[in-house]
C-alpha cells in the first residue's frame, strides 16, 4: 500500500505555485476579410498605426495604409499565396525601417534592405525609418560646392551642386540612365557615396548597370536598391524612400551622397495602382490626390547640411520618363516644380546623333551656378547663349538662300561647339579636360578645323595635354581656376594640336 506523505505533496504544490507565470502576451490580431491584387482587407487590428508593418500567417509582410471604420486596408510586400479569407494577421508594432551600415557599399538590396546579390548577409547594428522627416531650414546651408558629372555640356551650362535636386527628363531611350551612371562613375576618388534606386525596371537592365559599375570600379562606393517590374507595387512604391534613408545615414555622418531615382514615373504608377485598389478617390490621370506629396516629401530629403550638422549633403537626380516629349503631363510638371532645375533630353537630338541629347534651350539649373568652379564659370558664361542663338540661326538658315559672312561664321562656330560637346557613354571627363574643350570652342580657336574633324581634335587635345602638358592638368585640377599661366599653356597646346592636324590633312 502506497503511503501518502502530506509534506511531499505540499512541497510540490508550493513549487508549482512559485513557478506559475501569470503574465499574458497581448498581441493586436485581425482576420483577413478579402485578399487579391496585392491588397488585403483586414477586420480587427484596432490599435494599428498608419504605415505599420503587419505580418500574415504565411510570413508575408504588409503595410497598413487605409485605416477605416470597420476594416484596415493593407498592401502586401510579397506574393501572399498562402493567405486566404479567415487567415490571421498580426500587427508588429513597427514602422517600416531599413538596416544601414558601411557594409552596404557595393551591394544590391531589396527595398527592405535584404541582400539580393547572393553575397550573404549584410552585418548592421542600426536601422533608419524608411520614411523620415526632411532637415529643417536651420539645419541646412545653401548649395555652394560643385558635384561634377563628368559630362561637359552639363558641368558647363547646367551645373549641379551638392545638395541640389536636378531632374533628368525625357522620352524612353534618350540616354537618361546613361547620364546618371556617368555621374556615378565620375565620383571615383571624390569620396561621394552613391545610391542607385531602380524602380520597375527589367531585372536584366539592373544587372547591366551593376556590371558597368563593377567594370568601372564604381561599385565600391555605390549601393543599389532594386524593385524590378515583377516585384509587388508596394515594394516599387517604397524603393525610393529606402534609397533616401540609406543616403541619409551617410549624410548625417558628414559625407557627401548622390541618389538617383530611376525612375519616379514608375513609382507614381505603382502608387496609383495601390491607391485605386484601396478604393481611394482618383484625381487627374487617375492618380490619387496626394501624388504631389508622394514626390515632394521624398525630394525634400535632399539637402546640404549646415556645419553644425556635420556638413554632409545629399544630391538627388530623379528621372522622369515622358510620352512623346510631353512635359506638361501631370507627373512631369509636379516634379519640375519640386526640383531645382531640369535636364531635358530630346529624342530628335538623340536620333540626329547628338549624345548626350540635351536640349540646352529648356534645360536649366536654378541653384547650381553658385556652386560652379571658377575655371569653368569664367569660360562657359557665353556658351549657353551662343548655342541658343545657333539653334535659332540654324532654323532660320533653312529658309534663307544666301547668308552674310558673319552669320555663316556664327553657324560654323555653333556646329563646332555642338561637335565638341558630343561625348561617348561611360567616359566622363575631368575638370581640366572640360575647361580645355570649352575654351577651344568659345574662343574660336578651332574655327579653321573642318567640322567632321572636331571630335578627333577634342580627343587629340586631351591626349596631348595628358602626355605633354601634365602641369596644366595638375594646376587646373588642384586650384580649380584658369589663371594666366594655365591659359598660356592651354592656348599653346590648342594651336600645336590644330597645326599638326591641319598639316596632316
Swiss-Prot record:
Keywords attached to this entry: ATP synthesis, ATP-binding, CF(1), Hydrogen ion transport, Ion transport, Membrane, Nucleotide-binding, Thylakoid, Translocase, Transport
Membrane is among the record's keywords: yes
Subcellular localization: Cellular thylakoid membrane
EC number: 7.1.2.2
Membrane topology: Peripheral membrane protein
Residues that bind ATP: 170-177
UniProt-annotated site: Required for activity, residues: 363
One Pfam family linked to the record: ATP-synt_ab
GO MF annotation terms: ADP binding; ATP binding; proton-transporting ATP synthase activity, rotational mechanism
Reactions catalysed: ATP + H2O + 4 H(+)(in) = ADP + phosphate + 5 H(+)(out)
Organism superkingdom: Bacteria
Primary residence: membrane
Xref: PROSITE patterns: ATPASE_ALPHA_BETA
Assigned GO CC terms: plasma membrane-derived thylakoid membrane; proton-transporting ATP synthase complex
PANTHER family associated with the record: ATP SYNTHASE SUBUNIT ALPHA, MITOCHONDRIAL
Assembly: F-type ATPases have 2 components, CF(1) - the catalytic core - and CF(0) - the membrane proton channel. CF(1) has five subunits: alpha(3), beta(3), gamma(1), delta(1), epsilon(1). CF(0) has four main subunits: a(1), b(1), b'(1) and c(9-12).
Family: Belongs to the ATPase alpha/beta chains family.
Function (record text): Produces ATP from ADP in the presence of a proton gradient across the membrane. The alpha chain is a regulatory subunit.
Name this protein carries in UniProt: ATP synthase subunit alpha
Amino acid at each position: 500500500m502506497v503511503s501518502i506523505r502530506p509534506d511531499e505533496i505540499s512541497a510540490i504544490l508550493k513549487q508549482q505555485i512559485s513557478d506559475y507565470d501569470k503574465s499574458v502576451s497581448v498581441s493586436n490580431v485581425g482576420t483577413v476579410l478579402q485578399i487579391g491584387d496585392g491588397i488585403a482587407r483586414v477586420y480587427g487590428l484596432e490599435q494599428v498605426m498608419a504605415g505599420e508593418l503587419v505580418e500574415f500567417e504565411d510570413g508575408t509582410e504588409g503595410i497598413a495604409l487605409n485605416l477605416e471604420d470597420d476594416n484596415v486596408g493593407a498592401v502586401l510586400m510579397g506574393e501572399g499565396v498562402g493567405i486566404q479569407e479567415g487567415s490571421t494577421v498580426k500587427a508588429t508594432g513597427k514602422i517600416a525601417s531599413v538596416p544601414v551600415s558601411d557594409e552596404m557599399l557595393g551591394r544590391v538590396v531589396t527595398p527592405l534592405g535584404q541582400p539580393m546579390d547572393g553575397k550573404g548577409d549584410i552585418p548592421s547594428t542600426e536601422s533608419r525609418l524608411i520614411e523620415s522627416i526632411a532637415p529643417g531650414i536651420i539645419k541646412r546651408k545653401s548649395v555652394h560646392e560643385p558635384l561634377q558629372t563628368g559630362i561637359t555640356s552639363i558641368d558647363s551650362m547646367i551645373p549641379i551642386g551638392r545638395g541640389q535636386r536636378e531632374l533628368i527628363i525625357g522620352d524612353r531611350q534618350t540616354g537618361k540612365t546613361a547620364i546618371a551612371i556617368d555621374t556615378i562613375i565620375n565620383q571615383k576618388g571624390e569620396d561621394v557615396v552613391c545610391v542607385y534606386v531602380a524602380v520597375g525596371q527589367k531585372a536584366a537592365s539592373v544587372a547591366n548597370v551593376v556590371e558597368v559599375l563593377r567594370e568601372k570600379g564604381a561599385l565600391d562606393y555605390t549601393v543599389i536598391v532594386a524593385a524590378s517590374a515583377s516585384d509587388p507595387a508596394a515594394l516599387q512604391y517604397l524603393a525610393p524612400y529606402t534609397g533616401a534613408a540609406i543616403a541619409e545615414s551617410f549624410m548625417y555622418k558628414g559625407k557627401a551622397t548622390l541618389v538617383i531615382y530611376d525612375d519616379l514615373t514608375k513609382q507614381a504608377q505603382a502608387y496609383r495602382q495601390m491607391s485605386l485598389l484601396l478604393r481611394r478617390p482618383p484625381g487627374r490621370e487617375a492618380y490619387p490626390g496626394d501624388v504631389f506629396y508622394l514626390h515632394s516629401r521624398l525630394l525634400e530629403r535632399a539637402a546640404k547640411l549646415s556645419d553644425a550638422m556635420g556638413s554632409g549633403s545629399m544630391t538627388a537626380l530623379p528621372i522622369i520618363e515622358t510620352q512623346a516629349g510631353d512635359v506638361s503631363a501631370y507627373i512631369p510638371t509636379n516634379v519640375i516644380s519640386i526640383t531645382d532645375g531640369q535636364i531635358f533630353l530630346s529624342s530628335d537630338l538623340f536620333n540626329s546623333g547628338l549624345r548626350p541629347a540635351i536640349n540646352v534651350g529648356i534645360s536649366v539649373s536654378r541653384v547650381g551656378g553658385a556652386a560652379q568652379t571658377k575655371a569653368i564659370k569664367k569660360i562657359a558664361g557665353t556658351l549657353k547663349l551662343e548655342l541658343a542663338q545657333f539653334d535659332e540661326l540654324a532654323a532660320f538658315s533653312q529658309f534663307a538662300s544666301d547668308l552674310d559672312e558673319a552669320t555663316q561664321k556664327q553657324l560654323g562656330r555653333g556646329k563646332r561647339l555642338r561637335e565638341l560637346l558630343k561625348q561617348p557613354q561611360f567616359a566622363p571627363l575631368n575638370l581640366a579636360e572640360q575647361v580645355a574643350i570649352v575654351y577651344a570652342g568659345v574662343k574660336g580657336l578651332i574655327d579653321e578645323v573642318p567640322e567632321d574633324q572636331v571630335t578627333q581634335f577634342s580627343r587629340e587635345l586631351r591626349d596631348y595635354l595628358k602626355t605633354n602638358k601634365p602641369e596644366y592638368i595638375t594646376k587646373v585640377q588642384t586650384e580649380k581656376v584658369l589663371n594666366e599661366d594655365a591659359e598660356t599653356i592651354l592656348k599653346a597646346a590648342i594651336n600645336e594640336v590644330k597645326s599638326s592636324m591641319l598639316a596632316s590633312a
